[in-house]
């Protein structure tokens, strides 16, 4: 057993001392939010809670995500001069620019009694979203991505507004992050040539 420990320690030392291989820099993109739309299957009262929360989390992610360039100040109008716009993106190191529509495909809120705690209950919030990106300029399909999250939060017998807001914000944040991860994975794939 001792020789095996020595071998493992030696391997760990070699790995730690080996020069690190730098990963290729991640591609940069520009996303513009066009709309956050609840699907008809989502109940109206739940959509009323989900839509502003999801929209706020999407806007925040588009501003802060390291792979996204939030502002393209000085960019030519893509509708009037598409070639100049594409050249501008290349000079700024932006791989692509997209109009993004977010659909809320699933949303639910449920209060569940906790059997082991008589004075508490659990708030369960579920959010599922679908992102669709269309290229700027041209409005051809660029990517899709799906994300979902379920948050379970212990609350008292009376549900406070801030508990509900926290649960919706948390679920929306995780669902948006999940969808963006899927989008970026698809955007990193080599493009098929027609």
Give names to the regions the model predicted.
Residues 1-9:
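Bacterial N-terminal signal peptides that target proteins for export
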Residues 9-16:
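Bacterial N-terminal signal peptides
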Residues 19-79, 146-148, 181-194:
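A structural "domain/chain start" motif
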Residues 23-28, 132-194:
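C-terminal/domain-edge helix-coil "capping" segments
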Residues 35-39, 62, 106-108, 129-137, ...:
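Beta-strand elements of well-folded, non-transmembrane domains
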Residues 38-49, 118, 158-169:
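Second-shell loop/turn segments in exported
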Residues 54, 125-127, 171, 175:
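Hydrophobic alpha-helical membrane-association signature
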Residues 84-140:
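Surface-exposed short loop/turn segments
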């Amino acid at each position: 057993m001792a020789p095996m420990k020595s071998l493992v320690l030696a391997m760990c030392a070699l790995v730690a001392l080996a020069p690190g291989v730098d990963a290729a820099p991640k591609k940069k993109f520009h996303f513009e939010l066009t709309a956050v739309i609840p699907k008809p299957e989502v109940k109206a009262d739940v959509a009323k809670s989900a839509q502003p929360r999801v929209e706020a989390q999407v806007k925040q992610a588009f501003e802060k995500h390291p792979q996204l360039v939030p502002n393209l100040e000085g960019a030519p109008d893509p509708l009037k001069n598409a070639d100049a716009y594409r050249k501008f993106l290349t000079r700024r190191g932006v791989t692509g620019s997209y109009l993004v529509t977010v659909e809320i495909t699933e949303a639910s809120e449920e209060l569940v009694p906790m059997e082991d705690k008589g004075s508490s209950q659990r708030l369960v919030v579920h959010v599922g979203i679908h992102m669709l990106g269309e290229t700027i300029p041209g409005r051809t399909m660029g990517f899709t991505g799906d994300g979902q999250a379920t948050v379970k939060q212990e609350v008292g017998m009376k549900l406070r507004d801030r508990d509900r807001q926290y649960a919706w914000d948390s679920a929306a944040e995780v669902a948006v992050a999940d969808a963006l991860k899927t989008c970026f994975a698809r955007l990193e794939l080599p493009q098929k040539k027609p």
